[in-house]
Amino acid sequence: AICSLVLYLLTLMLMEKLSSNTVDAQEVELIWTILPAIVLILLALPSLQILYMMDEIDEPDLTLKAIGHQWYWTYEYTDFKDLSFDSYMVPTSELPSGHFRLLEVDHRVVVPMESPIRVIITAGDVLHSWAVPTLGVKTDAIPGRLNQTSFITTRPGIFYGQCSEICGANHSYMPIVVESTPLTHFENWSSLLSISSSL
């Protein structure tokens, strides 16, 4: 539509149907400056509102805090008392057969499927980024700042990701593994982990 209008005006100018008074008129310049500005504002305001609405989950079923360190992640399940752990990459020499090299961790993040999950992300030392592409999640972890993202898994499975911010020599050794399970399995896992951490 805009290209058509520009081509139409260009054609009129080349055919000299527009006089020099029309081309140099202040009114025309004012109109073609203000009209696009109004259109852009009318497009931007609803877009910004939708952008902020997409980032918020009204009432998540589970809130998880991910803290990036050089070169591992700490996870805290804030809805549970004393449920936290560090997650390190499993070295290739200790990797079980059939697991992915540089992607497997010693403690996976376990979440219930079909539940809104909020992840609060920060860092303890340098910039990191918590990214799980198959969940459509990538959020920067910045020291001293809390960022949040959210997701819902619709099926059980294991979702792999990595730190996607160059954070030092071992940046590629910060995998993220999210395991989505049915709610009953998640409840069993969380109670077992709570018991083992209290011992």
UniProtKB/Swiss-Prot annotation:
Keywords of the record: Copper, Electron transport, Magnesium, Membrane, Metal-binding, Mitochondrion, Mitochondrion inner membrane, Respiratory chain, Translocase, Transmembrane, Transmembrane helix, Transport
Residue spans, topological domain Mitochondrial matrix: 14-26
Keyword set includes Transcription regulation: no
Membrane topology (UniProt): Multi-pass membrane protein
Residues annotated as binding Cu cation A2: C163, E165, C167, H171
CC per GO annotation: mitochondrial inner membrane; respiratory chain complex IV
Localization (cell): Mitochondrion inner membrane
UniProt EC number: 7.1.1.9
Any single GO BP term: ATP synthesis coupled electron transport
Top EC class of this enzyme: translocase
Catalytic activity of the protein: 4 Fe(II)-[cytochrome c] + O2 + 8 H(+)(in) = 4 Fe(III)-[cytochrome c] + 2 H2O + 4 H(+)(out)
Subunit relationships: Component of the cytochrome c oxidase (complex IV, CIV), a multisubunit enzyme composed of 14 subunits. The complex is composed of a catalytic core of 3 subunits MT-CO1, MT-CO2 and MT-CO3, encoded in the mitochondrial DNA, and 11 supernumerary subunits COX4I, COX5A, COX5B, COX6A, COX6B, COX6C, COX7A, COX7B, COX7C, COX8 and NDUFA4, which are encoded in the nuclear genome.
Family to which the UniProt record says this protein belongs: Belongs to the cytochrome c oxidase subunit 2 family.
Classification via NCBIfam families: CoxB
Cross-referenced PANTHER family: CYTOCHROME C OXIDASE SUBUNIT 2, CYTOCHROME C OXIDASE, SUBUNIT II
Entry function: Component of the cytochrome c oxidase, the last enzyme in the mitochondrial electron transport chain which drives oxidative phosphorylation. The respiratory chain contains 3 multisubunit complexes succinate dehydrogenase (complex II, CII), ubiquinol-cytochrome c oxidoreductase (cytochrome b-c1 complex, complex III, CIII) and cytochrome c oxidase (complex IV, CIV), that cooperate to transfer electrons derived from NADH and succinate to molecular oxygen, creating an electrochemical gradient over the inner membrane that drives transmembrane transport and the ATP synthase.
The protein, known as: Cytochrome c oxidase subunit 2
Gene that this polypeptide is encoded by: MT-CO2
